[in-house]
Amino acid sequence: MTEPSPITLKGVPGSPYTRKMLALLRYRRLPYRLILASHDTPGLPAAKVNLLPTFYFPGPDGELQAVTDSSPILRRLDAEHAARRVRPADPAVAFLDSLLEDYADEWLTKAMFHYRWAYEADIKRASDVLPAWTRGRTSDALLAEAGKTIAGRQIPRLRYVGSNEVTGPVIEASYARFLDAFEAHLRDHPFLLGARPGGGDFGVFGQLTQLAMFDPTPMAITAQRAPRVFAWVGAVEDLSGLEPSDADWFAMDALPATLTAILKEVGRVYAPLLLANARAVKAGATQVETEIDGQPWVQQPFPYQAKCLAWLREEYSALNPGQRAGISEVLTDAGCEALIAA
């Protein structure tokens, strides 16, 4: 029997999306080859935009192509490899999985970026360690200089995620509420949508590898406030031994209240941001101005997140009338109904 060729990807441990996809590959039992790098790699094609992780898949001509964006890659792997899929078979439950993955990738990452570059202890940890993952065999002086360069590049980008003196407390309060809701959910359920992990779990895991396991300020908060969540991150790192079944997903007519509580946090903070950002992008505005959790929110428009909203609406539109009715009821209960409004 011929061994399957390993999937090649490039990434670093400090990238939440790299960690998301590595955990996914382990759970899927898909062989892979990780190149520990953050920049162009000799012998491999360059991506249009240098994002981590970068996957290298054979193109139609057999030549490798550089592919980025974790969510489409997750779906591609589900389409190409039938065993141990992470997308629920029920299209309505799959929609909820998409929403949770999107929330993790696009909102929880605000907490990750905010904590990493807003507090001195976290800035020092990141500046000291991030460059050492790819440039460890160098002098202390050069490593310190690399850390200063990374911090100097990343701290000004806080404005892109909406982190400032006004919005910082909103981000932190939202992270605390998410921890409380997820901690309560984990008392009875091992994963967001049942007894097997979905894309949303891997999205949340990716962000928590940094928030709960690397950056000192949110790490301390997580360990103290949500010990089950803290432990969950360590467990999800490698789920290759889990044996899932088709019956492990929640049924749409039996969603637990603890999941609704998590979705309410999505409706409270992420839904208004997605909607305001989409309006700003459509209008060609120079900044997003809205209110989130009773506080003013200002950030630069993000065209990618406008696409995220469009993709969610496309997925909802593809459901049959009964499935749409079920999703509409769940989202209304959670305060997310505006996401699917025409």
PLM features per residue range, with description:
Residues 92-100, 170-177, 181, 228-231:
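A non-catalytic, amphipathic alpha-helix used as a structural packing/dimerization or gating element
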Residues 192-212:
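GST superfamily/GST-like fold recognition
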Residues 1-141, 192, 212, 269-342:
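GST-like domain detector, emphasizing the conserved glutathione-binding G-site
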Residues 159-194:
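Short N-terminal edge-element motif at the start of the domain
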Residues 122-172:
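Divalent-metal (Mg2+/Mn2+/Ca2+)-assisted nucleotide/phosphate chemistry catalytic cores
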Residues 189, 194-198, 233, 239:
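Active-site segments that bind and position negatively charged phosphate/pyrophosphate groups
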Residues 205-296:
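Active-site/pore-lining binding-face segments in mid-to-C-terminal subdomains
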Residues 96-106, 181, 205-210, 235-238:
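Alpha-helical scaffold segments in carbohydrate-active enzymes
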